[in-house]
From Swiss-Prot:
InterPro entries: PLAT/LH2_dom, PLAT/LH2_dom_sf, PLipase_C/P1_nuclease_dom_sf, PLPC/GPLD1, Zn_PLipaseC
Keywords of this entry: Calcium, Cytolysis, Hemolysis, Hydrolase, Metal-binding, Secreted, Signal, Toxin, Virulence, Zinc
Binding, Ca(2+) 2: 320-321, 323, 325
Signal peptide: 1-28
Listed name of the protein: Phospholipase C
Cofactor: Ca(2+); Zn(2+)
Residues bound to Zn(2+) 2: 163, 175, 179
Amino acid sequence: MNKKKILKFICSAVLSFTLFSGYKSYAWDGKVDGTGTHALIVTQAVEILKNDVISTSPLSVKENFKILESNLKKLQRGSTYPDYDPKAYALYQDHFWDPDTDNNFTKDSKWYLAYGINETGESQLRKLFALAKDEWKKGNYEQATWLLGQGLHYFGDFHTPYHPSNVTAVDSAGHTKFETYVEGKKDSYKLHTAGANSVKEFYPTTLQNTNLDNWITEYSRGWAKKAKNMYYAHATMSHSWKDWEIAATETMHNVQIGSAGIIYRFLNEVSGTINTTENSKINEIMVVIKTANEDKAGTDHYIHFGIEAKDGKKYEWTLDNPGNDFEKNQEDSYRINLKDNKLTLQDIAKTWIRKERGAGVRDDWKPEYVKVIINSDVKYQANINEWFGDNKTFYINNK
């Protein structure tokens, strides 16, 4: 939606500073061709799993691991893509996550005076895990692996000490310098196993919490806190090269082992070895909408997502991110916070998206698909590929 929001001067100044000074706002280095630190992390995570635990895993997990391994290049490319997504936020706001505040730097940094972004590295991981799981179960293994790689990118981001501390390249030159330091030595940090006792002491812990949504958050929080603590202990610009080497070694080892844990949980989820549970009360809804890749498919009109409960009560939210959403060939994601609501999964009778009647010139819209994620699971989805005129409502109650 081209709402032509004017960001405040400070944001423009910061963006100019970031771009023209050569600083990067993203975390571990990664190349568009699926190489660099991010790709090394996921590659080693797969090797760690193969060396540690796959041989003793259930047959279904072994088979799914073989599929994943055969799509390793997709995993690698996915792991670097978020830094090159042309439609991403200019300052990579959603790559940050402070595990103590649950915010990215747009909520925690005093210098950032523009529009707050409610997506974080942690929420992106949950979203992409759900999307990858959904595609895998459909047999779309390449797409699923690519999406999982993207999720692992965000998981990797909050292992670099600066990201979980919400310290950007604007806050400290150390942000980029530390990442460059690690990139130059990345091969020296390679791991090939999570440890001699990992089969008994680590991997089982990744399956104990059957509530997937809660597990992703708390598993991520544990690792992110380690990285944040490492920032203050060894990784600021005031620390020595010896300190930086301590921080680099610790965080790079952690992210490889942690990523192996994410992949192991994913393989068990899609293999059906976990009796997954979920919260009845809905705390958050994520809505993912792709606008068709056709001429004039985008719209400037408002789009809404709605729910009707079985008691007849209706809820509706405007889907509106900072910047331009619902543009041609663009996928947009929205987080709807329901923590103060008493709505449960069992209450839902209908879900929909609705295009509002706009003032003035007619501006039709053609969505390609919509997916609704609750509890790290795609609950409702639909392939649409229809033109929406004024005030059109589309119901999306199919799984």
